[in-house]
Structure formats: C-alpha cells, structure tokens
Amino acid sequence: VLYYTDHEGKAHEFQLGAYQTNFRTEGAQEFSAVYLGKGTAAEYENVDVKGKLVLVDINQREEWWINFPVYQAHGKGAKALIAVQVGGYGQVDEKALNAQDIAGPPEAAAFSMSFEDSEKLKACLDEKGEITVTLDASSRVMRDVSTYNILGEIPGKRSDRMILLSAHYDSYFSGFQDDNTAVAMMLGIARAFIKMGYQPENTWVFCAMAAEEWGIADSKYDWSTGAYAEVFNVHPEWAGKVIGDFNFELPALSNGNLDGIRCTYEYKDFFEDTLKALPALSPAYPEGVLVSAPIETWSDDFSVAISGIPSMVNEFSAGSFMTTHYHSQYDSDEYYNEAAYRFHHELYGLLLMHLDRQSVAPLNFAEVFEQASASLDVLMCQKSGSRVTALLNLLGQTEEVAEEVYDRIYDINEAGVDSEQCREAENILLKVFKMAQDKFVRLTWEDAVVFPQEAAQNNLRHLKKAIRALKRKTPDAEAAFEALYEIDNNAYAFQF
C-alpha cells in the first residue's frame, strides 16, 4: 500500500499490485518517488534515482515487456519501479491493476499502479518531478519451492495409450476466465463421461497444471513451467504414449461470431475433417470454428507439444478481453458467456470421443513441409549459394509422401482396424512428430513460432536494407538505424 499527502494536505492511500520480485519494507517506510515517462535510458539522464521509487508508463503489447524498464531502474540504483498501464493491458477501467510474468531477476523490484491513482500522484510532483511517499509492502520470491500438478484418470481399455486434457489452476487476482473456467470445464467433461458410464478406448488423463503464469526466477522463459516440468521431468515417457493434448484457456469467453481451435500443423487436417462431421451444437458461433496452426507460446500446449505430444488449445486471444480484463482484478464472472461455455463443453467432448476412436494417431506431416517450403526466401537462398532448388524439391516430395501416409491412416481409422502393425506405425509417427518439433520449431525474440531459417532470413533482409540506405548518394543514417532496429531485439538496445 502506498500513502502520500497532496498539496492541500489530503491523505491518499493506493493499493498497488505486485510482480514476482523481492521487496519488503518491514512496516511503513518513507521514499522519494520520481516520474520518468516510459523509463528508457534517455529519461534517466541527469536524474539521480538511487534509493528512490521510479514511476513509469508502459504498454506491453505495443512496446516492451515489464522486465526492460524494471531492470533499467534496478541498474540505476532505484529501490523499485512502479508501472502504470497506459495501453495494451488493463484498459477496462482506469482503476485496473495489471500483472504479468516478470521475465527477470527477483532482485529488480516492481509494482503496478492503476492509471487513475498515477494521475493523482503525478499532479502532486514538485518542481523536481518528485514526491515523498510512504510504502508498506511485502513481496517475496521463495526459491526451490515445490508446487503440484493435479492428475486424475478415466481408465480406458488400454492403459499404455493416453489422451491428455489440461488447464492451469494458478491465476492472477481471482482469475475467473483465466483459467478457473477452463479447470471447471475439464472437470465437467470428465464428470459427464463418468455419469454416462462411458469407457474410453484409451486412458484419459486430466491434469490441472500449476505455475503456468510464472514459476521460475532469473529467466525470460518463466511461464508454463508446471506443464514443462510435467512432460519433460515428471512424465517424459508420455511422449510416444499420449496421442493428443486438449489444453483449455478462457473457454467461457466469446470472441465474436467465429470460434477457433489452434493446434500443431500435424493435427490441422484431422480437426478440420472432424468438425465437418459433428452434429449441430448449442448456438454460440454462427460462423463456425476455424482451425489454425501452429500453436503459440502463450499457453501450456506449446510446452506439451515440444516434448513430443501433439497438442491444441481453444482460441482465446482474438478478442478485446486481452486488452481490457486480462490479468487484472476485473477478470470476473462479468464477462461470462454461458452460450460459449456450453458450446465448448459439447465441442471438446465430441472431439475427445472422436480422437479416442482413432486406431492410429491422425497425424498429417504434409502441412509442416508445405509451410516449411513457403517460409523459404528463394531469392535470398540463391544469392547465398544455397541449394534451394534441391531443398524445395525434397520438401515437395516429402509433402507428397506425407499426404499418402495420411490417406492410409485415414482409411485405417475409418475401417476401425486395430492391430500390432497399427501400434508400430503409430510409434513411428509419434517419433517423427517429436523429431519435427526438435528440427522445425524455433522462436523469434518476440517468441513467435518460426522455422529455423526464418530468423536469419529476416535479419539478412534488414541488414541489406541498412546497407542500401548507407550506399545512397546521400547516405541515410536514420533509415539505416531503423533497419537495424528490426534485427533481433536491437530496438531495445537503443532504448535501454
């Protein structure tokens, strides 16, 4: 809690939000607070912030993540940084507080303040841009602490072949949509099948994941740690046994007339084909369901997929909720959409049953090779002396083989064939899936999923653009710098 007295002698009390950092006052303590715009390096020039609280504005969707201005303040000797959302997140109300993973060291302390409170505080700054405040705070990161993923099963006819359903149970604030409704839906689906006495062909594993929002200190990759630990450390043997993961995020939220499923490339055809054959569901999305690939890094299905388990998630990030209510105290039942929630119960219950009936995991690798081909900058490859024509031919041939394999899988599954040969074939398919994840999946500095050569291609484009700008009759240094900004995270190097 932050306290201060304004110019008229009126006392104010502001509730702050916390990040995963260390800051303990052990009772009320007085500090000087200073406002420094966006908190970039330039705004610290000729300003002494040692031992002070630094107030900054931030837009994490369009500019930079919280760790950049926080570490800048820490490096300048500030006691802590207080971030105010001026765009991007928490835009539902000027009273909104926002929380995100810190993606940095816990020693660089940070808090959040509502826009409304920040405006009141800024109005009381003196001629030096400072104000004396009192802060009573206790924020502590405890290292090497255990948390627990919670598992349950509906035993199938086969115990060695599984389907996973997952949702994370940790949350910021009350977390109604993110992700309590998802855990409830997962349990609701389990309850419905148990009540009807349904025995699946495969064992269904229901996993409430911990530490999705945050779970490891001193790392840029500090989210989805519970899921990562589950599939890499606790149950690495699931890869090769689990034929699919249905991960759920914010399922009681409606993002308009068109719903979405986001999955790995290899399951895109299966979901598209299955959706066409489903019976009419409760009305919620008049434009139907769009299947997209690949999966993204924002949810646990990514951690599950890179372990070798094909995964999907209900599309949850398309609407305005992410900029308004997401990760704020306003994530409550106010945004609850019963029609969407019922629809998702029905949809994923039916998809679960359909996947369960497949004799062989319906993986189609053709989309992977098609997208890999499309991601190649042919002209750039030719100029660099790469054998791009041979590579494209090889990718094309492999795509054709993958289509033939999928057609065979489709026929086997339609016929309901179940044999030892099917098991052997599926074992190979899941190994190929794991290999495809290892060989084809890479991340940009912004954590977008790309093919391995794409980051280098993009950097080369920007380098060439910078060179062209400098080789002009009148060299354009500004244009060259703008091109260099786009290489990796270079833009931040100019800001912090």
Language model feature labels by segment:
Residues 1-50:
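Noncatalytic luminal/extracellular "stalk/propeptide" segments of secretory-pathway proteins
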Residues 334-418:
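Charged, amphipathic alpha-helical linkers/stalks
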